[in-house]
Every structure is written in C-alpha cells, then in structure tokens.
Amino acid sequence: MEEDLIKRLEAAVTRLEGISSNGGGVVSLSRGGDFSSAAGIDIASSDPSILAYEDLISQCVGRALTAAEKIGGPVLDVTKIVAEAFASQKELLVRIKQTQKPDLAGLAGFLKPLNDVTMKANAMTEGKRSDFFNHLKAACDSLSALAWIAFTGKDCGMSMPIAHVEESWQMAEFYNNKVLVEYRNKDADHVEWAKALKELYLPGLREYVKSHYPLGPVWNASGKPASAPAKGPPGAPAPPPAPLFSAESSKPSSSSNQKQGMSAVFQQLSSGAVTSGLRKVTDDMKTKNRADRSGAVSAVEKETRTSKPAFSKTGPPKMELQMGRKWAVENQIGKKDLVISECDSKQSVYIYGCKDSVLQIQGKVNNITIDKCTKVGVVFTDVVAAFEIVNCNNVEVQCQGSAPTVSVDNTTGCQLYLNKDSLETAITTAKSSEINVMVPGATPDGDWVEHALPQQYNHVFTEGKFETTPVSHSGA
C-alpha cells in the first residue's frame, strides 16, 4: 500500500514538473501568489515565515488600503501598488526557499518582478506635480525598504536587513510627516492613511524581518538554479525610472533639460526667419539717449555695463568628501534621493546653492550647514556641534537623533522637526521669519504639534535697561 502511494505521489510531481517546464498551467494559491510547483503549495500553506508575511499583508497593508479607499484617486492607486509590491515579495520569498543562491546578475533577474512594481510607483511621482505629491512620494520612497531581500552578505554594500528597513523609512517619513501636518486638522482619513503607511514598515516589516530574516534571505543550496519568472506576451515598453536595486543614484530631473529647451527656443527665434527682416536701429534713429544730447550714456560705458552678467552662473553639481573632513553638496537641482551614508563625528557637511532637493545624512557628523538653498529638505541623525541654516528660503529639516544647537540666520521659511531625543535643542534665530518647530505629541500615536517661533519683539526701557519680550497675537 505504501509503495503504491509513493509511486502515485512521484507520478503527480513528475506531471507538475512537466507542466512547469512547458510553461503551461500555473497552480494558484488561495492565500495569494502563483507558483509552478507542488512544493510552492506546501511552503505557502505551512512555512511559518510565509504565514507571518501573509498576516503582515492582511493586517498592515489591508489597513492602508482601507484608509486609501476613503480618499480615492492617486492615493488609492499608489497604495494598490504598495500592496502589489508586498504580494510580489511574498512570491519571491516562496521561490527563494526552492532556489539556489544566484550570482549578482542572476539576482537582478530574480528580483525583477519586484523592481518592476516599484518602478510603477516611481512613475506616479514624475510629471506634473499632483495635489497628493507628498502621499505619492511617501509611498514610493517607502518601497525601497523591500530591497532588504537583496541582502547577500556584509560585503554586498547594503546595511543589514533590519537596519535597511529602518533607514529606508527615514526618507519616506520626511514626506509622510508632511501629510500628517497638512491634514491633521482637515481630514482624518489622510491622517489614518499616513499612520497606517508608517506602521506597515515600523514596526510591521521591521519586526517581520527581525523575526524571520535578520541575516537576509535563506536560499536553498540543493534547490534549482534561480531564473526570472516566465513573461507573458511583450507589451509596449515604457521609459523606466531609476530601479530599486540600482547601485547608482538616479539621474538629475528634467529641470535642466527644460532650461536648455527654452534656451534653444530663444536661439532659434533670434536666428530664424522671424527676425531676418529686422533692421538694426542706429544712434541717429533713436529718440532716447541719443549721442548728440547731454547726459547720454557713451557707447563705451554702455558696453562695459552690459558685458557683466546679471546673475552669476550656477556651478556644476557636486557631492564629494574633501580632504577626508568635509562633505560638499553643491548646486544640486531637483535631486530627491541624495544620501551620505559613510560619515563620522569628525566630518562636517556643507550644503550650498541647492534647490528642490532632499538630502539624507546617515550617521553622526560634527556639524551641518545649509547656505543659500531654496526648497531643500535635510534628514539627519546626530550632530556633535550645531546645525546651521543661513540665507535660505523654504527649507525643511528633520532631526532623528540629537542636535545641541540649531541656528537660523537670514532665512525665510523653515520647518524644523524634532524627535523625542532632541527636544532640549537650543534654537537661535536672527533676521529670520516663518520659523515653525514640530515636536512629537504627548502619546506615541499622537499627531505632531506645531510651534511658531516669534519674529516680533517688544522692547521696553525699564530701570536703566531694555527688557525684551516676544509679541503674541491673539485672534479675534
């Protein structure tokens, strides 16, 4: 009896393997994912790590989807992509248990399904800026946390899986906090969505990785070689954004290309048929500032004045460590994914002339300075000395560790986020306005509390000296 049963099982497995090798029928799992082997069914139904991942999807991803359905529009669309990415990672986790560890080239092909999903989310943040841009960026940037599955060892260039999830969320949290601040008194559905997104990763994904894969995915040494999943009929290719698992940073945004395009338009106008029939206006044809009138500007003087450019040219983008002591981040335009990951407490960071960019500093540094920047966000961990903001407009700074001093000088518009470990930070301001400080709420789940620093003061001469107090305005 037992021998007959074994033979029937072997025959069934052989038929399933034949179907799989021919690209035929795919076995559908009731709890998600498609796999072309009977082993996939057993793993998905009994393996504790897969069951725990399914619970993560049903609980945490489900909560985010429920909140997104109340909002609708692009927020729901990008949340569905997040759900798709988690489902794709679950499928990869099942396949890893049946697959030998591949080389780097094979790993890229193996992880391509997950990478394709993250590229769809990235595409939603491009083009015309949406009213829900902060939602889209928070969701898109959060997906980089799923790259923990690409960890292959300490020398692979990635942080350990648990640390990678935490570090990846830091960049997403920058935009997630904006959602919380913007909608905290406007729409509870958006606040619920932002909280659900954070809890999906912290503690959700972090605790899952900590419990099941603290050292990365465990491949099957006796399994089959890794290969990319079978593809369907090819569709029309779309221009892809930067991949999730790329070792290089993404290319600059199209803002510089737009500027070059406008310059080309003006150059074409000045050299085309439109202006070919125009005649040069000589001095004797002028009715203003003619050379024969007193007080006229001489041609030599005029040429000297006009030869100087009205604005200084922007230098080339720069992001480098100089002399081993100073990180120089200069002239970065439209770069949302700048990261300094290797730094120490003896180094300083100087950010100059940047616009519409976000920089993340991972680790402790001596001091950080932002100079002449517009619409720049900086997320940092710890500084030993001070964080300085000088000659800036509309900057946002988030401290995730500690900072003894934050100095704001000659700046209009600064949003400063302090965490529970940096509430004793000393903040000094001079010749600045619109300085708002966000601090955590009284409870772990509480909303951020905004405090506007005073920019008007009342000076009264009393008992031989001036006493200065901030001016407070009470609403009617």
UniProtKB/Swiss-Prot annotation:
Residues 231-243 have a biased composition (Pro residues). Keywords: Actin-binding. PROSITE patterns: C_CAP_COFACTOR_C, CAP_1. The keyword Isomerase does not apply. The keyword Nucleotide-binding does not apply. One of its GO terms (molecular function) is actin binding. Residues 224-262, 277-319 are annotated as: Disordered. Disruption phenotype: Stunted growth and reduced pollen germination and growth. Belongs to the CAP family. Residues 316-453 form the C-CAP/cofactor C-like domain. The C-terminal domain (318-476) binds to actin. Residues 246-256 have a biased composition (Low complexity). Expressed in roots, cotyledons, leaves, stems, flowers, pollen and shoots. Not detected in siliques. Residues 280-293 have a biased composition (Basic and acidic residues). SMART domains: CARP. One of its GO terms (biological process) is actin cytoskeleton organization. The gene is CAP1. It comes from the Eukaryota. This is Cyclase-associated protein 1. It comes from Arabidopsis thaliana.
